[in-house]
Design a protein with these regions (language model features):
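Lipid deacylating catalytic domains
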Residues: 1-59, 91-129, 133-310
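Extended, charge-rich helix/loop segments that form flexible
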Residues: 63-104, 133
């Protein structure tokens, strides 16, 4: 069993999934299951030379303050919220949507997946876990119909059964048994990508067993959205698709109004933490573990607030 991680925004190292791997390993060991082979792909390095948009915004704001006595908060409100979305999401997202950078990112992911398959030629089962923008990239790679014939996405499709016919009889192909997405805005960005859910259904129909897709949403993550209704999946079918929620008590209802100016800063940091915390949550690792081994009963019974539901 191979488990391939695809990270989301702001990640620039390959250790982002280590804590989650440890939790999954522990969960599998408790269940008497064999530990899979993990691989943390890393495409963030492609973005190291791209401009940091918020630096330009901050420079303009500083220049404004030098020449004006007006409080910057009166002419540019919610700056901490804006900084969060620009620095921690939009910067990487719109860079991926750039044709050249997007091609390069898909190339990096393709080469890393091919490296993994070459290193473990006897493994026939692939599972993909994608976070944030990584989920959007995965959706794009697997099912977009807009790429040119030489796009790296087709290298990935060529090694996954059901996505493309292998051109060589001896070519290695693996079965994609499960997908787990975490904190991903596929719902929003598919309006731009224009990918038909029918492509997913067609792919899933080529497998004897249902393809499992668990989409995990943390309650306070503003970038995470359910996808089941938008995909219009006729359940039961060859696709097992579940939106699963990770709950948390909404303390901001009572505390935010009393924080004054600190409220915006605190909430901005809270939003960032909510979006990145999937890598550290035991409830997330348990859902992934259940998805890896096909324990659909455990997935369906998962309680948003309880850790030990199985």
């Amino acid at each position: 069993m191979l488990v391939f991680f695809i990270h989301g925004v702001t990640i620039r190292t390959n250790k982002y999934a280590n804590e989650l791997m440890d939790k999954i390993t522990e969960d599998l060991s408790k269940r008497g299951q064999q530990v899979p082979i993990f691989y943390s792909s890393r495409w963030g390095g492609v973005l190291k030379n791209t401009p940091q948009l918020w630096n330009w915004v901050q420079q303009d704001l500083n220049n404004f303050q030098k020449n004006s006595k007006i409080d910057i908060g009166d002419v540019f409100q919610y700056s901490k919220y804006r900084e969060f979305f620009v620095s921690h999401f939009f910067n990487d997202l719109f860079t991926y949507l750039n044709l050249d950078y997007g091609w390069e990112i898909r190339k990096v992911i393709a080469l890393q997946l091919l490296e993994l398959l070459e290193k473990y030629p006897n493994e026939n089962e692939l599972h993909i876990v994608a976070h944030s923008l990584g989920g959007v990239i995965l959706w794009d790679i697997l099912f977009s119909e807009k790429f040119k014939s030489d796009d790296p996405a087709f290298y990935i499709r060529s090694v996954i059964k059901g996505l493309a016919e292998s051109k060589e009889k001896e070519s290695k192909q693996v079965s994609l048994n499960s997908i787990t997405t975490m904190g991903t805005p596929i719902l929003l960005f598919n309006l731009m990508l224009g990918i038909s859910p029918e492509n997913l259904k067609l792919f899933a129909s080529k497998y004897e067993k249902p393809l499992r897709w668990v989409n995990i949403i943390r309650s306070s993550d503003p970038l995470a959205y359910p996808i089941q209704a938008s995909f219009n999946i006729d359940l039961p079918s060859k696709l097992y698709l579940r939106d699963k929620y990770i709950g948390s008590r909404n303390l901001w209802k009572k505390s935010a109004p009393h924080l004054g100016g600190l409220g915006g800063l605190a909430i901005a940091h809270g939003l960032e933490s909510s979006h990145t915390s999937y890598w550290r949550k035991s409830r997330v690792s348990r859902l992934i573990t259940a998805n890896l081994i096909g324990d659909c009963a455990a997935i369906d019974s998962a309680n948003p607030f309880k850790l030990d539901w199985f």
